[in-house]
Amino acid sequence: TTKRGKDGVTKVTYDAYFGQQEVTKRMPVLNATQFAQLENEIYAPNPVYADPSLYGTGVNWQEMIFRKANIQNHQLSLTGGNDKTQVALGANYFNQEGVIKNSDYKRYALRANLDHKISDRFKVGTSLYYTVINENRIQAGGTNVDVSAARGGLLGMAVGAPPTLQPYREDGSIFPFADQYDGRYKEVSNPLGALAVKNYNATNRFLANAYLEVNIFKGLNYRAVFNADLVSSLNEVYSPRSIVDANSLANPLVNSGSAGNYSGYSRSLLHESILTYKTLFQQNHSLNITAVLGSQTDIYQSNNQTASGFGNDINQNWATNGAAVMRTSSSKSKSAFDSYLGRIAYGYKDKYFIDLTSRVDGGSRFGENHKYGFFPAVSAAWRIIEESFMEPLAFFSDLKLRGSYGTTGNAAAIGPYQSLATVSYGGPQNYIFNNTIVSGISPDRIPNADLRWEKSTQYNIGLDMAIFKDRLNIVADYYNKRTNDLLFTKSIPLSSGYTSITGNYGSLENKGVELAVTGRILTGQLKWDASGNITFNKNKVLSLDGTQNEIARSSFSILKVGEPLGVYRTYLSDGINQTGEPILPGYDGKTGGYKVKDINSDGKIDQEDLVIVGNAQPKYFFGFSTSLSYLNFDFSGFLQGVQGSKLFNAFRYTFENPLGQANVLAGLADRWSTTNPSNDFVKGNQGGRLPLTDRYVEDNSYIRLKNITLGYTFPKYKFINSLRAYVTANNLITITKYEGWDPESNSYGSSNDYFYDNGTYPAAKSFVFGIQANF
């Protein structure tokens, strides 16, 4: 969207690629015979299957949900203009099938950029961008901070689906598991039913930008910028009655098909006025003064409708008035920010530089006592290469030392009204009066007039170096960042009448070293460039809310002062309980169950035996890229890696637990028995509440070849200025010890203190062929 037109001949560019993606990894699970044997063990002395050997390998449910998926992208652009007016137009079409069946993503986009010089003093311009996104979604994995949530996503359904059951009835309709084997398998779901659930989302976005530049007099310029970002979305969900088992259909008001229509609209308006003065005086002194005034207003509103109890699946979302039960809700929110910035940049002899910045930001989301925050910054640089003592060191082409110190603010962690007292109505607040349900209202948030900006103060020292006529470039940085007044929602005693409060609690430190090296190794007919980077970061919680040094974030993770984010605390695994000794209140302590270590040697297993077993922060992460060209051929590649991090594999924890009904991972074929005293996997009738141990805190370090590309550029021919064809492979190789779907998984998205894998949408390997043409 930033491509601008240029003065000169009109140019047309067409870029396109076509390819295919697939997930190559499958979770190894028990086949039908092995599963039948396990079921018989669990339900002994009442076996489910008379002869397990008759079932063979059974149904491969993972193959039934995955597919090879096509992908294509087309980009057409036109640029041109004259000395007064420049125009750039573009159109894009992107179509990606999901590697899980019934999922896809389509995008249509148009853009137009216009710049026009009215006179020597006035210039105007605009950028317009319109996009339509249509997608069919699938919930691949569980998203709750709960070790049992893995079963709720499609990947969990496919792994846990009994291979002895049938996917379809004889008439071709989906066969609910609860309707097979006399309802024995009602606790597990046919994954094809989840694929049949409609989850369609349509998003329309219009982004408009306009600017006016005025040259008031030499050196003094004014620029006004106006932005409007308008987004409308529609989400349609429908779960058909055709996938509901017969027993559940006996309660049609609840289970006979369900629908949801969710519409949303957001509007973000931004204005910035920028005044800049640049001057050079006495030849050696440069001065740049900038003042900025900005304001932004965000509005979001939604209308939601849910319905259930449909008589048939004919109309789905389009006739919710035919449902037995229907509910509606709506919401609207508004927030605003304004900013004031002043900056002075001074340079002397293109050798010494200093930059002073003062910024004030205000946000309506914060408490009435702290709407505004002050964020100053200073930076300086010394171009050592310009000093006379560097003249003998001719192999240096650049050498610069720089440093900075400054404060920034964050408001993204809170919503529009989290500093205010709010109320809830409907649902659990409703009550009965005169035999009529009345909508009730109750307070649900404690106000916090002191809710304020989260502030990060960082200092940085860096060195930029280039040698051998810029053939080798090195950039090194040391940084130390401390974040105070963290925006955080903490739990409070229920006796308060509330469950949580949002405030500024705690502080966090990040410090580390970054190193980037770029080299032009060969510069002749064969050209070879390479670059690499590595970052070492240390992360530590400095304080919490002042009343405690530790906060539990889940059943296996904590926030703790002095430790990094994403700390895992569990019991230590001690193999299999070979003697049946008690291990923990709430656990059976049966022979063949998991055993944990008595850390404090007090003769019992309790909370005092929980220990920190790792954290999600990597010791370092790195990347490497290279490119070669010879004659008309070109080659490039990129790999990345992470080392030293841990990830709680909740997916593996779930499917190494032989509860019965659901299938389990293939390792359980070597489970404990009196004739096979394994020390790795529990016996068949030990399913239930397994202890959370370090067994499932895995090393998720990895090295991944992200992409390699081989291309060829054809000679210029008539009206074709250039034509390049290429092939690319993405996510080609991953080296890791991690046993989950993907070592980069985090089921809680971008959260910085929850790290676990409940089975997220797996990374796909892809191969594409593309062309780039210029006319």
What do these predicted regions represent?
Residues 4-101, 139-144, 164-199, 212-215, ...:
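Residues embedded in well-ordered regular secondary structure
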Residues 36, 43, 69-72, 107-109, ...:
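Extracellular/periplasmic, surface-exposed regions of secreted and cell-surface proteins
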Residues 31, 624, 773:
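Aromatic-residue-lined binding/catalytic grooves and analogous aromatic/hydrophobic interfacial grooves
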Residues 135-158, 526, 544-550, 737-738:
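Low-complexity intrinsically disordered tracts that form flexible linkers/tails across taxa
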Residues 615-648:
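Glycine-rich, aromatic-lined ligand/substrate-binding cores of catalytic
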